[in-house]
Amino acid sequence: MTSAWLAFWNGSHSIYVSARHKDVHYRLIAKAMAALVPRPHARVLDYGCGEALHADAVAAAAGELLLCEAAPRVRAGLAARFANDPKIRAVAPEEVERLPDHSLDLVVLHSVAQYLKPEETAALFALFHRLLKSDGLLVVSDVLSPHVGAATDAAALLRFAAANGFFIAAVAGLARTLLSDYWRLRSRLGLTRYSEAAILEKLAAAGFNPQCADKNIGHNQARAAYYARPR
């Protein structure tokens, strides 16, 4: 991840239009992740987890949950928020690299690939292949395809907002976004996008048997999710 994106996520931002938006966003992700946990004693890694407000729901279904976040301020917040949950540990990316081989049952990379260079994503896939057990699962979700633009994302947010009681805040938030640091960064740096064929090829090159999932994790079904198992 470029230093500009890391600084953005480590600072104060308005990517969520309201507290309600942030809450239902993370709740939806946690519910989907919990459903993917294969067994009660599973070791799970959420890589690039953000604030993960409802990570306790995932941990309740697992034996251990590692929350990996590169932004130091966010990582400190995670450690404080879940300090009393013995199943949850906030870790830095370099700590993940030191984990034992074949020690994880589930790895989730949600809404991260668009902020990484292709070679960074390839390196992560190789790392996850090393860390996953032979029957483990990698989930790469919220992947942007080349044809999904900002208008599609905005429409998905408005539908999500209307269904969850923050529509007016979403309209105002979208207007603010056009003047925000996020939009300036997105316009300057762009977002990394993958066709289905491209992401499947990248996963296969890292040693996985990948497939496109029927449904994306999160509210935006114009984006895609992929399941991959080590071969």
Please place each PLM-identified region on the residue numbering.
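A conserved beta-strand element that flanks and buttresses the S-adenosyl-L-methionine
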Residues: V108
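Conserved class I S-adenosyl-L-methionine
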Residues: H41-G50
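A short glycine-rich, Lys/Arg-flanked "PGG" loop and its adjoining helix->strand segment in the class I
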Residues: A122-S134
